[in-house]
């Protein structure tokens, strides 16, 4: 079974820490067991106090804006990274972290994914994957960037990539992981399976065995963030 979700201004909810969330694929909306996916907006001058999550790894993909990402290292020291559009952040379970937007005028938009599993991913990973650090591979549909590999996220069970579909090209296949999704970062595509328009901010959520066919019928490239997770082996 496949599910489609899209961001809408009236679906964003203000949270107690000051950010706005728009829930996409979750356990309630898509019967997802491994992923909880949310669009998140941090308005200007929003500082989110450092904290930990003890039930999941947390993944950020920066869509728009610039911010600061605080991460605690295994030796107890803290490192603050600059984050920008296209950067990916992987926070392993129980890692102290905080994300802030110090801009006077620019909001920080991110895709937030909680990955639920038993066990513990490697806490010694760096945690921040800058967009310009990921090599780009050519593909029949355009290009592929492997942003999340076992070395970058500390687990064999999660894979993350940024895909670019060129005009006139098609990305097609079958979900091979337990859960998988595509999120349209920019551009507009058409899903033939299931049939639907995929505008920027739309998520297509799949389970193992589901077929997908995403066509770029426009004149501009389409960029997708794709994440998949299998049964935990940690």
What are these model-predicted stretches?
Residues 47-49, 68, 87-89, 93-99, ...:
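Histidine-centered metal-chelating micro-motifs
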